[in-house]
């Protein structure tokens, strides 16, 4: 069974999204330790809260997909990420850095369920193959990041 081209675009998008996110984990830890002079414990707690923001974003992203559709949900998540990244560049002192990082996790979290749901909607006959491809893209993204 061949995966449709539209699903491949979603797989590529997921791989890029997760690669970028996982690339930032060690970079954020170094920045918080060396530039913001916070302990590794604090850096770990901030990244944990960032992950909680992602979970909340996942929940909201799934709900928004049901109400607005995939395109608008991904657009809202991407806009949230763009705003938080811009604010990270402008206000990168403590505690603003941690706040914008949590907002970045929230926005990124909104994108993930929308991609899964869009893939299922685009290729309903794909069954497990659709979701396995996206799951594999997430794993590749983490490995590359």
Feature-to-residue mapping (PLM):
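Residue-level signature of mid-helix packing/kink "hotspots" within the transmembrane helices
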Residues: 51-59, 142-143
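Cytoplasmic membrane-interface "Motif A"-like loop-to-helix N-cap segments
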Residues: 67-78
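Paired small-residue
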Residues: 84, 95-103
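Glycine-rich segments within core transmembrane alpha-helices of 12-TM secondary carriers
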Residues: 132-145
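C-terminal ends and interior cores of transmembrane alpha-helices
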Residues: 79-92
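Helix-loop boundary and gating motifs at the non-cytosolic
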Residues: 5-51
């Amino acid at each position: 069974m061949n995966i449709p081209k539209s699903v491949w675009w979603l797989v590529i998008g997921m791989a890029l999204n997760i690669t970028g996110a996982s690339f930032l984990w060690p970079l954020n830890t170094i920045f918080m330790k060396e530039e913001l002079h916070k302990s590794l414990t604090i850096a770990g707690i901030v990244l944990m809260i960032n992950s909680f923001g992602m979970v909340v974003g996942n929940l909201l992203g799934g709900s928004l997909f049901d109400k607005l559709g995939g395109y608008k949900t991904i657009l809202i998540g991407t806009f949230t990420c763009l705003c938080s990244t811009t604010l990270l560049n402008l206000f990168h002192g403590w505690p603003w850095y941690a706040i914008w990082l949590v907002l970045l996790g929230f926005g990124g979290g909104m994108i993930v369920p929308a991609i899964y749901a869009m893939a299922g909607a685009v290729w309903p006959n794909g069954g497990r193959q659709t979701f396995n491809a996206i799951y594999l893209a997430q794993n590749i993204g983490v490995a590359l990041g």
